[in-house]
Amino acid sequence: MNKDAQMKAAINQKLIETGERERLKELLRAKLIECGWRDQLKAHCKDVINEKGVEHVTVDDLVAEITPKGRALVPDSVKKELLQRIRAFLAQHASL
């Protein structure tokens, strides 16, 4: 395992141990609902299903279709807030 992978694993482990990972996930979930991201993605899913026909769409097809759009629709403000929280966490746990 290279240095980057080791560092990533150590950070992830610390996030899990402290419960910060769950808090970050909950914050992300709330922010995405608040900004309408979830509703936009749900509407896009319905459009894809209606376009292709419910019998011709698998879950894997739907995931492949909506993942890029879902990532692109995340507002910059949400990304920045999460990044700020992660940086603050790393600053507190600089011994990693």
Curated annotation (Swiss-Prot):
GO terms, biological process: chromatin organization; mRNA export from nucleus; positive regulation of DNA-templated transcription; protein transport; transcription elongation by RNA polymerase II
Q: What is its main location?
A: nucleus
A single MF term (Gene Ontology) = transcription coactivator activity
What Gene3D superfamilies would the database entry show?
Answer: 1.10.246.140
Q: Which UniProt keywords apply?
A: Activator, Chromatin regulator, mRNA transport, Nucleus, Protein transport, Transcription, Transcription regulation, Translocation, Transport
In which domain of life is the source organism classified? Eukaryota
One Pfam entry name: EnY2
Location(s), subcellular: Nucleus, Nucleoplasm
Annotated GO CC locations:
DUBm complex; nuclear pore; nucleoplasm; SAGA complex; transcription export complex 2
Q: Give the coiled coil ranges.
A: none
What InterPro entries does this protein map onto?
Answer: TF_ENY2, TF_EnY2_sf
Tell me how this protein assembles: Component of the nuclear pore complex (NPC)-associated TREX-2 complex (transcription and export complex 2). Component of the SAGA transcription coactivator-HAT complex. Within the SAGA complex, participates in a subcomplex of SAGA called the DUB module (deubiquitination module).
Summarize the protein's role.
Involved in mRNA export coupled transcription activation by association with both the TREX-2 and the SAGA complexes. The transcription regulatory histone acetylation (HAT) complex SAGA is a multiprotein complex that activates transcription by remodeling chromatin and mediating histone acetylation and deubiquitination. Within the SAGA complex, participates in a subcomplex that specifically deubiquitinates histones. The SAGA complex is recruited to specific gene promoters by activators, where it is required for transcription.
Q: Which PANTHER family match?
A: ENHANCER OF YELLOW 2 TRANSCRIPTION FACTOR
- Provide the family line: Belongs to the ENY2 family.
Q: What is this protein called?
A: Transcription and mRNA export factor ENY2
Give the encoding gene's name. eny2
